[in-house]
Amino acid sequence: MLKIVKLKMNYQENPIGVTQVPQFGWVLESDKRSVIQASYELQIRADAELKNVLFDSGEMISDESAHVFAEGFQIKSAEKYFVRAKVTDGDGECSGWSETGYFVTALLSEEEWKAEFVSAESKENAGESKGTYVRSSFRVKGNVKAAYAFTTALGLYKFYINGKKVGTDELTPGWTSYLKHLTYQTYDITTMLKEGENGVGAMLGAGWYKGKMGFVGNRNNYGEQTAFLGQIHIAYEDGTTDTIVTDSTWKGSDAPVVFSEIYDGEIYDARLEIEGWAEAGFKAERFWDVETVAFDKKVLEAQSFSKVTEVEPVTAKRIFQTPQGDTVIDFGQNMTGWIHVKVKGKAGDKVELNCFEVLDAKGNVYLDNLRGAKETLTYICKDDQETEYHPNFTFMGFQFAKIASYPGEAKIEDFTAYAVHSDMEQTGTFTCSNQDINQLQHNILWGLKGNFVDVPTDCPQRNERLGWTGDAQIFCRTASYLMNTYHFFAKWLKDVAADQTPEGGVPHVVPDILSGKTDGDWLLEQGSHSAAAWADVAVINPWTMYLTYGDKKILEDQYSSMKAWIGFMEEHAKDYIWNYKLQFG
């Protein structure tokens, strides 16, 4: 029996946030050998009942099951399109229609943005790393056919409708060259709305945008205040529409995240929680007027791909005492992510966990490799009810956690770690009869997971965690055997292009938070960039993506960047010898 088992659009199943007609592809399954596709038919429809056909390819004589295009089809903003396909093999057997998939479009033009970035902070808060709330309410006037939210932030954010978090992604919108390239997210909130008043809000954290970054420790690399951008499109059954936007009517407040930094961890004081802050009917007397923040919306790009998520839980393996008397949790696996903590105490009781990677030779806590990073999770109880907490706007590289403070007896079942990284489908595995080689492969895979948190980093634990271009260039091919990295690298390569110098030079790290930060420093001074092998990422990575996936689009998107880098080398390679300023190794 011939059938389509995976219908994909842009290498994804049911993507949300598409801004161009996607590429289509599928996986065939058959009980026969040597099956070759002879033809396909692709349909796009406007409704789940598949009555309103918008596009029908007819039978196309082709063995292509990837990079299939719906030639001539045009999409509209904030719409859901339903897709199905069928194929016929060389023996004339037809698969029948696949299960119906879908894709949802984002906003297709800058002009459609009516929202403004809003902030509960002012520039006087530039030195602070606390969390804030922004909120509003709106009315739903009838039966909702579909509702989509388009959101992003300067900083990190969590988005809420009627008191419930929207989406499963974390550390959103991730790390980009914010002032030149910022992703926004699309959410289907149709089932979260109710007729009448609805509450909407976001909690914001400093993140990569204004937090302390790099081994130099500079903060406010992109701006001095966090801000949220949100726009909701509602389509009613009667054909009318509504648009809800962030603007100066929104209100702001401090959040219970009293401190949050990428390197140092988070302090969350549950006593400061504001009940119902993102729900309908909330009285915001203690909230203040937000500030609107100017930002160029031309740099916004819809993200339908590789969002950071909690990917897998890792249970604690043991709790033990070190020779120095510290109580330590061992999760049995070095990972990047955070810890879910269950705790029952009284108001003011504190949980404090210091995360770290290894024990020293004597079996004690070892922190030297963290350098200046603290990697500390702190939770302060608000009452005597059992609760569960995990950090909002930070992540750690760890296998162990020292229990510096915990009310009562710490039980192993109270602690569960979660690996957190960009969501990518695993596409390659390797096992053999040699357990040492198997362990090496295991370490490579977990090393990939730990260093693919929105950008390809050098490490996940110390006060660095930067997108070193040389590391990404060297590991790109291996990573692409193990995971579907197409969207992960395509997104990051846009920041490579964005951060190139006007002449075409490539920074040592992308996003570039190092260049020009310290006068006279051999590594950081302005003009220190474009090292051999590191800067070659501008050409090698797009080419590797093309060789791996056969998709010319990434070459089209990156061509100007690739050409600029080659031109830069030609300009500065005297007598064809490349020795431009700083070279590593």
What are the residue ranges of the model-derived segments?
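Structural recognition of the beta-strand scaffold that forms the well-ordered cores
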Residues: G167, G201-A202, G467, I540, ...
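Well-ordered alpha-helical scaffold segments within catalytic/enzyme domains
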Residues: Y406, I474-T485, A538-I554
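Sec-exported extracytoplasmic/periplasmic mature domains
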Residues: K449, T501, L547-G550, G567-K574
